[in-house]
């Protein structure tokens, strides 16, 4: 059985939710990984974390509209909704990632 995930429509992605999702260092690191790759197995986003912790953080990113999750067999593949974020909030993701890279 393939699991389906709820994702907000692009029009429903809000700045406060996106900023909240990006405010956590763990989720920010996940987004940095996703920004470099097309899709990542969810377990590769937090190999040293309990699965429940990875699930918690990926759920917050997905519900905020930052990521898209798709199920394929026993794996969950996560991808960054870059086009949605860049359209709704031009420059936001690049600024956040650049600021984090400067640390």
Region spans (language model):
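Short alpha-helical segments that sit at the start of domains
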Residues: 2-28
